[in-house]
Regions:
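Catalytic-domain carbohydrate-binding cleft regions of carbohydrate-active enzymes
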Residues: 1-248
């Protein structure tokens, strides 16, 4: 919230797909609840849909469903629910998840694992992805389908963006090439952050530098709902359909 207040142009933060962290924060800073709620309501913070980010295979089906229901209910109290199922680092995703998420009103799902074939001793075989793109259609056994977004370059592929032009040029030459290699549209997803990493307060300046270096590219500090809406509007390729469990 301090960055929202003090850093001009710093406007978005995805709270890792869950709401439980809000309880911890408000136990200490209860006096800031109204301010926090206002940032969530305006879309600066994206929260939910989970109550706590889980590993689906380590919990029961009932626990997975209730985790989602409680997370949505909790997020609604603050005025906004991010309608993107989120599994950045789950070690496999259950086959019924598109069915569960769709019934809960989710519009897409983002995940980091499970779209490469797995061979003996859980070794990933070569570079043969089950989908040609980082965007795909994930289908449950009952036929339910959701747009899936694979973090093909992982969930920290846009972290620590340089502000200085020489370093930024080297950084963006590599990042744009890597993300564009898998993307089905011109909209490239770069995730600015990683585990245990502070926010990048000078992100607006870093994106300003990027815009100067690449005048034909629009760099936006955005969020999942905006990105997914843009992807859906721009899709002109038939996406691969991946059915059932995603395990790798």
């Amino acid at each position: 919230m301090k960055a929202f207040e003090e850093e001009k142009g710093y406007e978005k933060f995805h709270l890792d797909g869950q709401t439980i962290v809000l309880e911890d924060y408000l136990e200490i800073y209860l006096d800031r609840k109204d301010e926090l709620t206002e940032y969530i309501r305006k879309g600066n913070f994206q929260i939910g849909p989970w109550y706590v980010l889980q590993d689906e295979f380590l919990t029961s089906g009932e626990a997975n469903v209730r985790n989602l229901l409680y997370g949505i209910e909790d997020a609604k109290k603050y005025g906004s629910v991010c309608k993107t199922g989120y599994f950045p680092d789950a070690f496999g995703n259950v086959g019924q998840m598109p069915q569960i998420l769709k019934q809960a009103g989710m519009e897409a799902v983002a995940f980091g694992r499970g779209v490469r074939p797995v061979g003996f001793n859980n070794q990933v075989e070569g570079n043969d992805y089950l989908s040609a793109f980082s965007e795909l259609t994930w289908k449950s056994p009952d036929g339910s389908e959701l747009l899936g977004i694979l973090f093909a370059n992982w969930y920290n592929n846009g972290s620590e963006i340089p502000v200085e032009e020489t370093a930024a040029k080297e950084y963006w030459d590599r990042k744009l090439k890597d993300a564009g290699k898998f993307a089905a549209t011109e909209h490239l997803l770069l995730m600015n952050g990683s585990d245990h990493q502070p926010i990048q307060k000078n992100l607006p300046e870093a994106l300003e530098t990027a815009g100067k270096l690449y005048p034909d590219v629009v760099f936006l500090h955005s969020d999942f709902p905006t990105y997914i809406e843009c992807v859906k509007k721009s899709l002109d390729s038939e996406l691969s359909v991946v059915t059932g469990e995603l395990t790798s």
